[in-house]
Each structure stands twice: as structure tokens, then as C-alpha cells.
């Protein structure tokens, strides 16, 4: 085991400047070297006898000794050596002290090198006397400092202190900081930002945009600024220089002169000129700007008028070159026979979605209609559909087996039957057959109804897929596809059947995915397949279907997506318990404020029969509608309500979407819906076709998940108010309600 050896101590520093001899003068020759000292390297020792000359010469160590010593050193180094904490600190401080001294020595050497060769020559001259010829001596220092040294014999002045090192901390602090950095690591959050450098950097590149008035020299030499020309006007004045009064005076003088020259033909020409002048005044100028869009002719409508028109009906469109909406049925572009049917059915004014969607559909463009419930979407796709298939050859024995020309997909049986009733009003007078394919009926019976062929088939996705898989129906010549309530179909799990139906369509008449799909002339010449999708919301699955099967569609948005129509007044009441809600329902029905038909919604279908019995005990007739009813029972219940044979319909969310019952004055949510979308479609059963309605909702603490959305919907409505108990409820303050509280506890 060998002890740790310390390195030899550093050489002593050079003697101070005050004890050094002055340099030799340059005018005195150097003394000759001693005779006994040779100038070259001494190779032969002197003949003089030295002490210990007769002793035995020390022999060098052998190889075995060297190897043995090396093995001993390696063995000792391999053995662990215990060092106490004090020894380790002492070794580290000693090592650090040497590093600091070495760094200080290097800095002093670099500082001394800045003075040139004067210091070097001075130290060399003071340390030893030259012993060789002049050529072997160090060079004499030159420059101004050397001349001062020769004159007064002093050293060169010390170098000027560096500005950067002028405020250097003392060595003890620097040493402590370096030791701290070595053992604890560098500081991670230490900022290297320099405010002085940043300020300097920004002020150098800052451009001054201000200018003074005395810098403007245009007044000195440009006469335009000193002699401004005044425009001369006639009469009251106008930008063109003439007013209407002056123009009328000139026209009147011209007409009088014309009549005097030729009383017969001049008077006729004067009448034509006056008529032209009158029309010019009516059609142009300020008078047209002041007119409302309803008072203008179609050719006089400007871009500003169309913008105001869209704002009035809350219409938003996007998707390329989209035609302007129609203001009335006469400007729709529909054939005369279809317009006569519209008038016969009783559609006086088109709804907002009909104004925007029909002109686009007549150009054979694919369409996505995002409209609130109860906005009249059925007629917006039925009328363009009839115009399209009227251009196709009629069905006969040769093409009857190739399937229908158009299919309409609906999520529920009730909605499909309702669409079939509305479609038959327009299709039957034009000679087109319609067929409905829904569940609840015998599939063989429905196939027998289609034995003569049908141009239009309205179906639910599940039953239509069954017919296609059983080879009872083919879609070989289907050229028109409509998906009504597409988001509802996706929610009910019909995404896969919808994809199967759309994949079964022929690809020969599919539109190209290019700019030609937006050209109405090209689409009409080719008679390509046209696809229309109507929805109230746009979930991801609906967007996925639209991207796959629609080509450059035009998107029409009516109102705000997910909001109720403005014709429905929403009232909400905080009532806990079934019995209290039944008493409040009896008060509402007995108030006489609302006339039948009335719809009451509940969340659980077993409550339908119980609530219906209670309503009968109150003195009102009622029927029920829920998922456990057969198709015949559903149709009978809706027929009784439409024919006003019963007063109240008690239903679940099955009837909350797509069921069109006219003149529903009141909707009561006996149980608050589980989602705000279901609530929107429930209250959409009233206030349809531009009529007003009322929706009353009972809510409790169990509905905390939807209270925030309910409060937001009431806030956006202009005819509804938010009650204080709902406004201050804890669950209505943030989205999520009770779910966020549960997540916070877990």
C-alpha cells in the first residue's frame, strides 16, 4: 500500500522589482566570459576530485525489480483506501487551490505578455549577466517604454486595468463560487438576459414615424395647396354637377322645342322620352337604395339587398358559386305545373330553408341542409326531386324492374310515413308513384305494393337493407338520394346500413370530384346522381358520410344549429317529486290557456301509461306512444291526435323527432330530457310552420347534467326568460354539472 504523494511545490515567484539590478548600459561593452567556463555543453567532467569519487557506482535497477515494484503498486492501487470526510475535503480544497493558482498564473502571464518584450528583457537582464557574444544576448527592448527605462532606469508602467475586470469579485468569493458549482452543479434558472444589451438592441433599430409640420415643404412651391379649385354645381348640386331639378328643366325645354317643330310625331316622341325619364328615376339613383328588397324587382336587387335578405331569414351559405335565394314562389324557377300544385296545397310563402335550398337543388348540386326542427325541410327536397325525375323516362314494363328513381331515407317509421304523405300530395297529380318501406309491416306485403314500380321510395335504413339483401329491390337506376334527419340515423346506429345502401347505388352516374361538380350546366347535361342530406347537427359520423358520398356540396345553414325556433316560448319550473308535478300538470290543463292537441313527454316508457291514466282522471282524453307499441298502434295513436279525437299524447323521445302534428299549442316535459338535443327536438313539436307555441319543462336536482345547456338555450332565446332558481343553481354555473363533481371526488 503506497501513500498518496503530493506534487512538487511550484517554483518561487520572481524577485520583486525593487531588488532587481538595473539593466546594463548599452554604450559599455560586456565583460569577457570567465576562462574556466566553456561556452558549449559540458560533456566531460572536470579533473578536479570530488567527494565520494572512490565510492562504488550505483547500479540501475533490474527489470525484475521494476516489474515487482509495478505489481506492488498495482496491487496497492486496487485495494480500497479509506479516507475520512475531513481528508476528502482537504484533498479537494488542495486540488482546487492548485487549479486557482494555475489559473491565476496563466492570467498574470497573459497580462504580462501585453507589455511586449520589455518585461521579458528586463527580467532576463536582472536575473543573469550575459556570458556570450552580443549576438547571443536577448534583444534589447524597443519602443517608447524602453527609452524611458534607459533614461531614468525604472520599470515600464503597469498596464491599464481592464474595464471588464475592474469590478471583479475577490478571489475568496470566486473560489467559493467555483467550489459550490463543482459540488452542487450549475444553476439551472439563472438568467442570462441583459437589459442593457436588450435596450441597446431595440433602440438602434427603432424607426421614428413621427414628423413635424415644418418638414412639409409642399406649400413652398406647389400651387395646388394654395389655390384649391372649387367645383361648380347647378341647382342644389350633386357629384356630377347637375340635380334632378336641372335635368327635368332641360328635358322639358327639349320636349317643348320638339313639339313646336313637329306637332304630330314630336308629341309621340315626347311621350316616349318622358316615360323613359320616369323609369330612369324609378330604377336608378337614390330612390332604389331607399327601397326595401321586397319592393324591388329581381333585376334591381343588388349585393347589399341580398345580404339584408339573408340576414332577415337567418340564412348562411357556403360552397362555391351558390345562387341567390328565392324571394317568393314565382322566382323559384319551378315549372308552372309544380307552382300550381304548391298553390293548391296552400303554401303561401316559402320558409327560410325552402328559399335557400330549392334554387341550389334545381342546379343539380349536392346539398347539405343544416336547419332547425320544424322549418319545412320536406318540401325543400320533394319539389326539386319531382322536377328532376320528370326529365327521366316514365316507368314501364321495360325498366320497372330496375328499381326506383329516387330513395328517401328516414330514421323512424313515423317520419317515413309522414314524408310519404307529404310527397304524395305533389307526386300523385304529376303521375308518379310513391312507396314506403318500414318495419312493423309484412315485407311481402310491401313488396306486393311495389309490383307496378314506384319512382320514389321512402324507407328506413334497416328495412331497405333487408329488401336489397333478399333481392326484392334493386337500385340500378337510382339517381336521386335524400337523407333526412341524418344525425338521428347515426345516433340510432344506422351508419352501417346507410353505407350499405349508398354503396349499392350505381357508379355510372356518379359526379366527378372536380370543379365540374359546381357547374350547373355540366351537371344538367350529364344527369348525374344528386345527393341531398338534411340534419339538425353535424357530428363526426355525418361529416364522414358527407365526405365519402357527396361531391362538392353546397352547405345551407338556417338559424343557429342546435337551438330551438324563435316561435317557441320556453318556460321552466323547478318541481321535485311526481305528485307535485301531476298537480302542476292538472293546473296547466285546467287553465284553459292551451287548446288540444297537447303532447306530454316522459323519459321512461312505463310511466306513459301511468301519466295517461292520471290525465284521463283529470277529465282529458289521452293516448300513449312508445317503443313497445306495434306499428299499427303507433299509427292509430297519431291518427287520433291529428283528427282531434284525443286531447293529449303521452310519449317518449320516440315522438320527439320528425313527427309533424299541426297546431300543437303546448309541449310539457314531465321529465327533463337527458340531453339538450333531445330537449330541442321535443319542444320543436310546437311552433311549427311559423306558428307560435309554448313549451313547459319540469326539472329537478336529478337533471344537473343538462342544466347548464338549458340555461344557455334560454339565454339565447328572445322570448324566453331564465328563472332565478335555475340561474343561481350550482350545476348551471359550469358545463358538465354533476359529472364534474363526481370526477373531482374520484
UniProtKB/Swiss-Prot annotation:
Indicate where this protein resides in the cell. Cytoplasm; Nucleus
Q: Which Gene3D superfamilies match?
A: P-loop containing nucleotide triphosphate hydrolases (3.40.50.300)
Annotated region Disordered: the residues are: 1-203, 721-746
User: Which keywords are on file for this protein?
Assistant: ATP-binding, Cytoplasm, Helicase, Hydrolase, mRNA processing, mRNA splicing, Nucleotide-binding, Nucleus
Q: Which GO terms describe its biological process?
A: mRNA splicing, via spliceosome
The EC number(s) this enzyme carries:
3.6.4.13
Motif window: DEAD box: 484-487
Q: Which residues bind ATP?
A: 371-378
- Family designation: Belongs to the DEAD box helicase family. DDX23/PRP28 subfamily.
Q: According to its record, what is known about the domains?
A: The Q motif is unique to and characteristic of the DEAD box family of RNA helicases and controls ATP binding and hydrolysis.
Subunit details for this protein?
Component of the U5 snRNP complex.
Q: What does this protein do?
A: ATP-dependent RNA helicase involved in mRNA splicing. May destabilize the U1/5'-splice site duplex to permit an effective competition for the 5'-splice site by the U6 snRNA, resulting in the switch between U1 and U6 at the 5'-splice site. May also act to unwind the U4/U6 base-pairing interaction in the U4/U6/U5 snRNP, facilitating the first covalent step of splicing.
Entry-linked PANTHER family = ATP-DEPENDENT RNA HELICASE DBP3 (PTHR47958)
Q: What is this protein called?
A: Pre-mRNA-splicing ATP-dependent RNA helicase PRP28
Species classification:
Eukaryota, Fungi, Dikarya, Ascomycota, Pezizomycotina
Originating gene: PRP28
Amino acid at each position: 500500500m503506497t501513500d498518496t504523494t503530493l506534487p512538487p511545490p511550484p517554483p518561487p515567484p520572481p524577485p520583486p522589482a525593487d531588488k532587481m539590478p538595473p539593466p546594463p548600459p548599452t554604450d559599455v561593452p560586456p565583460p569577457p566570459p570567465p576562462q574556466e567556463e566553456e561556452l558549449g555543453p559540458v560533456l566531460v567532467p572536470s579533473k578536479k576530485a570530488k567527494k565520494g569519487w572512490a565510492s562504488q557506482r550505483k547500479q540501475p535497477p533490474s527489470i525484475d525489480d521494476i516489474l515487482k515494484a509495478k505489481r506492488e503498486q498495482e496491487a496497492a492501487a486496487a485495494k480500497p483506501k479509506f479516507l475520512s470526510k475531513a481528508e476528502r475535503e482537504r484533498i479537494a480544497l488542495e486540488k482546487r487551490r492548485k487549479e486557482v493558482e494555475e489559473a491565476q498564473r496563466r492570467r498574470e502571464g497573459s497580462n504580462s505578455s501585453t507589455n511586449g518584450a520589455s518585461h521579458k528583457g528586463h527580467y532576463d537582464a536582472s536575473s543573469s549577466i550575459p556570458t556570450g557574444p552580443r549576438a547571443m544576448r536577448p534583444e534589447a527592448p524597443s519602443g517608447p517604454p524602453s527609452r524611458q527605462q534607459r533614461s531614468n532606469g525604472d520599470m515600464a508602467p503597469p498596464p491599464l486595468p481592464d474595464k471588464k475586470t475592474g469590478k471583479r469579485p475577490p478571489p475568496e468569493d470566486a473560489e467559493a463560487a467555483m467550489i459550490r458549482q463543482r459540488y452542487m452543479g450549475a444553476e439551472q434558472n439563472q438568467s442570462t438576459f441583459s437589459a442593457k444589451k436588450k435596450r441597446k438592441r431595440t433602440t438602434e433599430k427603432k424607426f421614428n414615424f413621427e414628423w413635424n409640420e415644418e418638414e412639409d415643404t409642399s406649400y413652398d412651391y406647389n400651387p395646388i395647396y394654395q389655390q384649391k379649385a372649387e367645383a361648380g354645381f347647378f341647382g342644389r348640386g350633386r357629384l356630377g354637377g347637375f340635380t334632378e331639378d336641372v335635368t327635368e328643366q332641360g328635358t322639358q325645354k327639349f320636349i317643348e322645342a320638339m313639339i313646336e317643330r313637329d306637332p304630330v310625331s314630336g308629341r309621340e316622341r315626347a311621350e316616349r322620352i318622358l316615360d323613359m325619364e320616369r323609369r330612369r328615376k324609378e330604377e336608378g339613383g337614390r330612390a332604389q337604395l331607399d327601397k326595401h328588397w321586397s319592393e324591388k324587382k329581381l333585376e334591381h336587387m343588388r349585393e347589399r339587398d341580398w345580404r339584408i335578405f339573408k340576414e332577415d331569414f337567418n340564412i348562411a351559405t357556403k360552397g362555391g358559386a351558390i345562387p341567390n335565394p328565392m324571394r317568393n314562389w314565382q322566382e323559384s324557377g319551378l315549372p308552372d305545373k309544380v307552382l300550381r300544385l304548391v298553390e293548391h296545397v296552400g303554401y303561401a310563402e316559402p320558409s327560410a330553408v325552402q328559399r335557400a335550398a330549392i334554387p341550389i337543388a334545381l342546379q343539380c348540386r349536392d346539398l347539405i341542409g343544416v336547419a332547425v326542427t320544424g322549418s319545412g325541410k320536406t318540401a325543400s327536397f320533394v319539389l326539386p326531386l319531382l322536377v328532376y325525375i320528370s326529365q327521366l323516362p316514365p316507368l314501364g314494363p321495360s325498366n320497372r324492374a330496375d328499381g326506383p328513381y329516387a330513395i328517401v331515407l328516414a330514421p323512424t317509421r313515423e317520419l317515413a310515413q309522414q314524408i310519404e304523405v307529404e310527397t304524395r300530395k305533389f307526386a300523385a297529380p304529376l303521375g308518379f308513384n310513391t312507396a314506403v318501406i318500414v318495419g312493423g309491416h309484412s315485407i311481402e306485403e310491401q313488396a306486393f305494393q311495389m309490383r307496378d314500380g314506384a319512382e320514389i321510395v321512402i324507407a328506413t335504413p334497416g328495412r331497405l337493407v333487408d329488401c336489397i339483401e333478399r333481392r326484392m329491390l334493386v337500385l340500378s337506376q337510382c339517381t336521386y338520394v335524400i337523407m333526412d334527419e341524418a344525425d338521428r340515423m347515426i345516433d340510432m346506429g344506422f351508419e352501417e346500413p346507410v353505407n350499405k345502401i349508398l354503396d349499392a347505388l350505381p357508379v355510372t352516374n356518379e359526379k366527378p370530384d372536380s370543379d365540374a361538380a359546381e357547374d350547373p350546366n355540366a351537371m344538367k347535361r350529364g344527369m348525374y346522381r344528386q345527393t341531398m342530406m338534411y340534419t339538425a347537427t353535424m357530428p363526426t359520423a355525418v361529416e364522414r358520410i358527407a365526405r365519402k358520398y357527396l361531391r362538392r356540396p353546397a352547405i345551407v345553414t338556417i338559424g343557429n344549429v342546435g337551438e330551438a325556433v324563435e316561435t317557441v316560448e320556453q318556460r321552466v319550473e323547478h318541481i321535485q317529486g311526481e305528485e307535485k308535478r301531476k298537480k302542476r300538470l292538472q293546473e296547466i290543463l285546467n287553465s284553459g290557456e292551451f287548446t288540444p292537441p297537447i303532447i306530454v313527454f316522459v323519459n321512461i316508457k312505463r310511466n306513459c301509461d301511468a301519466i295517461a291514466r292520471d290525465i284521463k282522471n283529470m277529465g282529458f282524453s289521452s293516448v300513449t306512444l312508445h317503443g313497445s307499441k306495434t306499428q299499427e298502434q303507433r299509427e292509430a295513436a297519431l291518427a287520433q291526435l291529428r283528427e282531434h279525437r284525443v286531447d293529449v299524447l303521452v310519449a317518449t323521445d320516440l315522438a320527439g323527432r320528425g313527427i309533424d302534428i299541426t297546431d300543437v299549442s303546448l309541449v310539457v316535459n314531465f321529465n327533463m330530457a337527458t340531453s339538450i338535443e333531445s330537449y330541442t327536438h321535443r319542444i320543436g313539436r310546437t311552433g311549427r310552420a311559423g306558428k307560435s307555441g309554448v313549451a313547459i319543462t319540469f326539472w329537478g336536482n336529478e337533471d344537473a347534467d343538462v342544466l347548464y345547456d338549458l340555461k344557455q338555450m334560454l339565454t339565447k332565446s328572445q322570448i324566453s326568460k331564465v328563472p332565478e332558481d335555475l340561474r343561481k343553481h350550482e350545476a348551471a354555473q359550469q358545463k358538465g354539472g354533476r359529472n364534474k363533481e363526481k370526477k373531482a371526488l374520484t
